[in-house]
Amino acid sequence: MCELCQTMDLTCLYVCVRIQIKGGAVIMCTAACFKDKDCYFGKNLDYEFSYGEQIVVTPRNFEYGFRYTDEPSYKYAIIGMAHVSDGYPLYYDAMNEKGLGMAGLNFVGNAYFNPVVKNKTNVCSFEFILWILFQCETVEEAIHLINEMNLCDTPFSASFPPASLHYMISDSNKTITVESVKQKSIKTYKKRQT
């Protein structure tokens, strides 16, 4: 029995929900990862309008052009939901060919991204999903990269400022939430083991 929902006969790993009401419109994201004999990862985007999102496949070794850091030497293929601007996939959520999934969820009023920091791996918030999924097979590998990086506040463009997000990262064995908040920098939360 799932300790979170008390109804499903599955081993739930994590559920992350964030709701914000603006002018009568409900803006919400829900992400979930659970497993029985298989592992399931998914997210919805409950907006009353579209940003032009589409299913996007980014092939192995795609040259993304990260703003402040070198390209990883090898990059996994990725599929997910993204808005494409100037040839760059701005992923909302995605999964790589190794089965590592990642979703960005609303965190308005709480998300804080830092200015660029010298002598640190600086990854822009809009690059974060690609940065992790290009080079990690597991949540543990993602945690290692996250501990070495600065999630910075550089906008993609004048039309696309940093989105106020926190993130869920999941593989078949583990799920974490990643939050970049003021005074704590990047914090990871693991699902409590039972």
What are these regions (language model features)?
Residues 1, 134-137:
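Short, surface-exposed alpha-helical recognition segments that flank or form part
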Residues 21, 96, 171:
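Acidic surface patches and DE-rich sequence motifs
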Residues 136-194:
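Accessory structured domains or lobes within enzymes
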Residues 38, 125-126, 139:
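Alpha-helix initiation and N-capping motif
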Residues 114-130, 135:
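Helix-start/capping segments and mature chain N-termini
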Residues 27-121, 148, 153:
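A contiguous strand-loop segment
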Residues 5-6, 11-27:
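Short, Lys/Arg-enriched N-terminal segments with co-localized hydrophobic residues
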